Amino acid sequence: MKFIDEALIRIEAGDGGNGCVSFRREKYIPKGGPDGGDGGDGGDVYLIADENLNTLIDYRFEKRFAAERGENGRSSNCTGHRGKDITLRVPVGTRAIDNDTKEIIGDLTKNGAKLLVAKGGYHGLGNTRFKSSVNRAPRQKTMGTPGEKRDLQLELMLLADVGMLGLPNAGKSTFIRAVSAAKPKVADYPFTTLVPSLGVARVDANRSFVVADIPGLIEGASEGAGLGIRFLKHLERCRVLIHLVDIAPIDESDPADNIGIIESELFQYSEKLADKPRWLVFNKIDTISDEEAAKRAKDITERLGWEEDYYLISAATGKNIPQLIRDIMDFIEANPREVEEEEKAAEEVKFKWDDYHNEQLSERGFDDEEDWDDDWSEEDDEGVEFIYKP
């Protein structure tokens, strides 16, 4: 199935049903008082994370989703039915963004997580709501409010513990194949990897971590060269980045310069991503002697001023990979995801009609604590005000 990590859809919550103006009319009860019911609320639109999905391709073809409208109120104090909600299933790791305001509505980082993205319109109030000691026969109602409408940008960001960085043909896909059961395409030409992929690296029966491989970066990627830098977003949730470097490039380029290119593109994309823990791993040491590999790695790190540890591996032969995998696992266990990052709630999103009813009732001086008896005297019309509203 084609991997799609971005989609723009139109979502429309249901409109609220209108309130009803009605009066109780029964034999021997000539003035039974108001009995108009409220309308029903409009249906909401939700997103729910589904671990069985791994692409947003479904939303490339069907782009408009609308919830049901609330039913109008009826006489005999009958409230209209609420509109049915709709729930859209998306992959775990999806972020919802309002395309007009660029407001992040929320992230779905756990299977089964549910997110309200468009709130249905509020129901209108029937004339029963406006009865009071001074208004015995109100002819007033409110209309249901329109449901929220949004152009929603969906962005899928893969959930992985380790992210792979490097130029094209640095050996990232070969590394994924070496440490996991994933089988990304491997070939001797640039940009063999066109879409991100995941692999599960298992250290032993009870310990494993997830590795994310993305297409390689080249100089000018931030300006659109190659496949650009848009796939870097898939590394934002990783705990550590593995910068894989070809220690003996076939084009005879300088590995130190290649490292500088990746770091520059990383900083241009996001300083937050650039500040993540980053490990330097020299690959393809099987193409040169061990002594030459050690000498080159030392020279490169000295020129870069790299003071951290680094690794020398061969993804093709598996040399030194078991030790690297164990060290990564130890780092992940020693640095669990921060609680605030794992359970971080999105900033409260203000929906359009949150305060609508309070405003409507306060404008009309309605006190919901007032009680009124239906058996009022026919002659007692003091203070009765008839309000006509279309």
Curated annotation (Swiss-Prot):
Pfam families, per the entry: GTP1_OBG, MMR_HSR1
Domain Obg: 1-159
GO cellular component assignments: cytoplasm
Entry cofactors: Mg(2+)
EC class name: hydrolase
Region (Disordered): 362-390
Assembly mode: Monomer.
Function as written in the Swiss-Prot or TrEMBL entry: An essential GTPase which binds GTP, GDP and possibly (p)ppGpp with moderate affinity, with high nucleotide exchange rates and a fairly low GTP hydrolysis rate. Plays a role in control of the cell cycle, stress response, ribosome biogenesis and in those bacteria that undergo differentiation, in morphogenesis control.
Name of the protein described by the UniProt record: GTPase Obg
Organism this protein belongs to: Mannheimia succiniciproducens (strain KCTC 0769BP / MBEL55E)
Source species taxonomy: Bacteria, Pseudomonadati, Pseudomonadota, Gammaproteobacteria, Pasteurellales
